[in-house]
Design a protein with these regions (language model features):
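Radical SAM [4Fe-4S] cluster-binding motif and immediate context
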Residues: 5-157, 169
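C-terminal EAL-domain catalytic cores of bacterial cyclic di-GMP phosphodiesterases
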Residues: 161-165
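Glycine-rich beta-alpha loop elements in corrinoid/cobalamin-binding modules
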Residues: 1
Length: 172
């Protein structure tokens, strides 16, 4: 279980100018041909109580940035919402949280929550990989470009979240 993996940051004391990498899940429900994460066929989650406890440690230490390295952070909506709510409710006005997401999976409830956060609290790295429908099909990527565009525009409309979109050069 992911909860058995020890929290390695508790022995550190100096977090100034550090970026912390953190994982609340492993695996990915998708089967994209280019990605090693598709080998791990199931999405496994660290318990929310443990995640909140560990996030509070980062917040208390005023870590400048916590970068979630979950492959698709918002693949499990309840998990993502609970973490985003916790971050908003416990904002220390210093720490920034970075998430790798699939924008076409964002729900209206998630967009409303994200748009209500303080400017700079969250940044989103959005996996697009390609906008060519033939390429998307060839790489076995599950994505709705219209939903993605709409979600990116809705998040962008609040002006509080930095977003960047990932594209992979050299795909078929």
């Amino acid at each position: 279980a992911l909860d058995d993996i020890p929290f390695l940051y508790s022995d550190l004391s100096d977090f100034e100018n550090r970026i912390i990498y953190y994982e609340s899940s492993r695996g990915c429900p998708f089967r994209c041909k280019y990605c090693l994460s598709s080998i791990d066929k199931q999405l496994r989650l660290r318990s929310l109580d443990l995640v909140k406890k560990e996030l509070q440690f980062f917040l208390d230490k005023k870590v400048p940035q916590v970068k979630f390295i979950d492959r698709t952070f918002n693949a499990k909506h309840e998990h993502a919402l609970a973490i985003w709510r916790y971050i908003k409710e416990n904002d220390n006005e210093v720490t920034n949280f970075h998430f790798e997401i699939s924008a076409d999976l964002l729900t209206e409830k998630e967009i409303i929550l994200l748009n209500s956060m303080r400017k700079g609290l969250v940044q989103l790295e959005i996996g697009v990989q390609s906008t060519n429908p033939d390429t998307i099909r060839e790489i076995n990527r599950s994505m709705d470009l219209c939903k993605l565009k709409c979600a990116v525009e809705k998040v962008n409309s609040a002006g509080n979240i930095h977003q960047h979109l990932d594209l992979i050069a050299g795909l078929p």
